[in-house]
UniProtKB/Swiss-Prot annotation:
Belongs to the bacterial ribosomal protein bS21 family. One of its GO terms (cellular component) is ribosome. One of its GO terms (biological process) is translation. GO terms for molecular function: structural constituent of ribosome. Residues 37-64 are annotated as: Disordered. The lineage of its organism: Bacteria, Pseudomonadati, Myxococcota, Myxococcia, Myxococcales. Residues 43-64 have a biased composition (Basic residues). It comes from the Bacteria. It comes from Anaeromyxobacter sp. (strain Fw109-5). This is Small ribosomal subunit protein bS21. The gene is rpsU. Keywords: Ribonucleoprotein, Ribosomal protein. Gene3D superfamilies: Ribosomal protein S8.
């Protein structure tokens, strides 16, 4: 769980900025977006295979 303690003399905006950075670093927002809607295991596998194929094609193009 991400948490931020407000230091003496620290503004709310600075504390909020630190909290957002910690959330981003922990991957909380991307995890929330990923879990927002249920995705069947077969769909997950297809997306994963497609992403791997795209990475391979990109890597091939880069090597030429």
């Amino acid at each position: 769980m991400t948490g931020v303690r407000v230091k003496d003399g620290e503004s709310f905006e600075n504390a909020m900025k630190r909290f957002k950075k910690q959330c981003e670093k922990a991957g909380i927002l991307s995890e929330i977006r990923k879990r927002e809607h249920y995705e069947k295991p077969s769909v997950k596998r297809k997306k994963k295979a497609l992403a791997a194929k795209k990475r391979a094609m990109k890597k091939m193009r880069k090597s030429f």
